[in-house]
């Protein structure tokens, strides 16, 4: 009889343990499902933020391109004015060489390659002031 009780109690303990393991597995799988769902939500939010960030960066890049494109055109005009001033000054100092320089002209690519982008940011306003001043002097002289 004691043996039957021992077997019955052992059976109850084993079945209780099996139920607790099964419940643990179910709760674990439920947690995993919840974690996966939350990760999907986080990824969705992250993807949305990433797409918004990309579009904002594209717009910002486009704006910078337009702004610096205009500035490059202004720099180009300043360089043209400076070339004209240099040609005029050369013609005053050396009249025989002025015609040769005008015939040859200045290569725009060579002049553009002399300045890096950093130099343009620093020298751009200075060159525009010098160009405007020299242009005004030439108009007064001419």
UniProtKB/Swiss-Prot annotation:
Gene Ontology terms: cellular component: extracellular region
Keywords: Amidation, Amphibian defense peptide, Antibiotic, Antimicrobial, Cleavage on pair of basic residues, Cytolysis, Fungicide, Hemolysis, Secreted, Signal
InterPro entries documented for this protein: Bombinin
Gene Ontology BP term (one): defense response to bacterium
Record's keyword annotation contains Aminoacyl-tRNA synthetase: no
Signal sequence region: 1-18
Subcellular location, record wording: Secreted
Domain of life (superkingdom): Eukaryota
Modified residues (Phenylalanine amide): 68
Residue numbers carrying Isoleucine amide: 141
Tissue: Expressed by the skin glands.
UniProt propeptide residues: 19-43, 72-121
Main localization category: secreted
Function comment: Maximin-y shows antimicrobial activity against bacteria and against the fungus C.albicans. It has little hemolytic activity. Maximin-H16 shows antimicrobial activity against bacteria and against the fungus C.albicans. Shows strong hemolytic activity.
Family statement: Belongs to the bombinin family.
UniProt name for this protein: Maximins y/H16
């Amino acid at each position: 009889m004691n043996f039957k009780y021992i077997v019955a109690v052992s059976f109850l303990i084993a079945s209780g343990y099996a139920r607790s393991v099964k419940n643990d597995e179910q709760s674990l799988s439920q947690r995993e499902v919840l974690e996966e769902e939350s990760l999907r939500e986080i990824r969705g939010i992250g993807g949305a933020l990433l797409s918004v960030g990309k579009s904002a960066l594209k717009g910002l890049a486009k704006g910078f391109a337009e702004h610096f494109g205009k500035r490059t055109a202004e720099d180009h005009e300043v360089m043209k004015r400076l070339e004209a001033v240099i040609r005029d000054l050369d013609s005053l100092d050396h009249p025989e060489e002025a015609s040769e320089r005008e015939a040859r002209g200045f290569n725009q690519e060579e002049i553009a390659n002399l300045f890096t982008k950093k130099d343009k940011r620093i020298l751009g306003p200075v060159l525009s002031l010098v160009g405007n001043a020299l242009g005004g002097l030439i108009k007064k002289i001419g």
